[in-house]
Structures are given as C-alpha cells and as structure tokens.
A protein has these predicted regions:
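Positively charged n-region of N-terminal signal peptides that target proteins for export
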Residues: 1-5
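Bacterial N-terminal signal peptides
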Residues: 7-16
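Sec/Tat signal peptide C-region and signal peptidase I cleavage site
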Residues: 17-22
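Short acidic, Pro/Gly- and aromatic-enriched capping/linker segments at domain boundaries
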Residues: 23-35
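A generic secondary-structure micro-motif detector
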Residues: 26, 53, 89-92
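Extracellular/periplasmic catalytic domains that process cell-envelope and extracellular macromolecules
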Residues: 30, 37-40, 69, 108
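Boundary/entry segment of secreted carbohydrate-active catalytic domains
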Residues: 32-54
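Aromatic-lined substrate-binding rim segments of carbohydrate-active enzymes
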Residues: 60-126
Length: 126
C-alpha cells in the first residue's frame, strides 16, 4: 500500500509538471453558488470516459478528437492498478500505460482530464 501511495504521488507530480510546462497561465477552477467556475466564468463539465489502457496509443489522438467533435470538453480516466503494478512493487507507466502522455495528448486537443486513481473502478475490469 505504501508503494502504491508513493507511485501515485510520483504520477501526479509528473502530470502536474507536464501540464505546468505546457500551460503558461494559471487557471482557477472553483464551485460557484449554482455552477462550476473556470477563471471566474460559468463552466459546464461535459465529460467522456476513455480507458487509455484499452486504446492503442496510436489511436489516442483520434479517440480524443472524436470526443471533442461530440462537444465534450473533458476526458475522465481510471487508473487501473493491476495494469500498472502487475507485480508487487514494480510499476509500469510506459507506452500504452503512460498516463502523463495520455493527459498531454488530451491537453494538446484542448481537453481537460479528470483522473480517478481507484483502487475501485466501475469499468467491467478484472
């Protein structure tokens, strides 16, 4: 459990710093009285669920573009720990399992990402 926590903290650090490098201005997201606010303006989260581990990395751009074409502005992803830690203490965030790369790809298309780290995932996943 301690190793998972450390890995999770490292992962979020990578995601935060990768986003900070690509974005030059700070954004402010908050809950208003009756709506979410992004930079002080009303914001509706229109989210699509994508499972990056089920999509070959070469198709990430295409799937994200399809979500955007449907009017989505956010991608929700689960972190499937049994993919990233198939052997206790050995973590794999490379290739198709590269969460930071997936988040950067979404950002490249102007999409936001909501990351849900689990351990429970409601995605028919073993």
């Amino acid at each position: 459990m301690k190793n998972r926590l450390i890995a999770l903290l490292l992962l979020f650090t990578v995601i935060i710093f990768s986003g900070a490098q690509a974005q030059t201005t700070a954004r402010k997201f908050e809950a208003g009285k009756n709506t979410f606010l992004l930079d002080g303006k009303p914001f509706v989260v229109k989210a699509a669920e994508l499972h990056y581990t089920r999509i070959p990395q070469a198709y990430w751009d295409h799937r994200i573009e399809m979500c955007k074409a449907l009017g989505m502005n956010t991608i929700c992803i689960y972190i499937f720990w049994n993919i990233h830690e198939q052997e206790e203490g050995k973590f794999d965030f490379s290739g198709q399992n590269d969460i930071a790369a997936f988040c950067r790809t979404a950002q490249k298309h102007g999409m936001y990402v909501i990351v849900r780290p689990g351990p429970y995932v409601c995605a028919e996943w073993e």
